[in-house]
Design a protein with these regions (language model features):
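STAS-typified acidic loop motif
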Residues: 2-28, 50
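Amphipathic alpha-helical interaction surfaces in cytosolic regulatory modules
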Residues: 22-93
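Short acidic-hydrophobic, aromatic-tinged amphipathic segments that line or gate anion-handling sites
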Residues: 95-97
Length: 97
């Protein structure tokens, strides 16, 4: 799993590459913490192959912790990853670009 942070300020992008499984979730959580202060977190999932339920929980917890004004946008999901968000209903909570 590779996570690359792009940008600073109000909108920060995390580019995700590989499999975001349970073992990668702590690194994902740390990367998200590194975006504190941003009003919008964009997750570039164009090279993401898999996302685990623990990573989904991390996203929900982050949204809840940072409040209603904080936005999480999902970008470039493949069919497999998109289906996870559709089935869980999280595509209704996060902005899909």
């Amino acid at each position: 799993m590779e996570i690359t942070k792009i940008g600073n300020g109000n909108e920060v992008t995390l580019k995700l590459k590989g499999c975001l499984d349970t073992t990668a979730t702590p690194d994902f959580a740390a990367a998200i913490e590194g975006t504190a202060g941003a009003a919008t977190l964009v997750l570039d999932m164009s090279e993401l192959e898999f996302i685990s339920s623990s990573a989904l929980r991390q996203l929900v917890a982050t949204k809840k912790k940072r409040g209603a004004e904080f936005k999480i946008a999902l970008l470039g999901m493949n069919e497999v990853v998109r289906e996870v968000f559709d089935v869980t209903g999280l595509d209704e909570i996060f902005e899909v670009r």
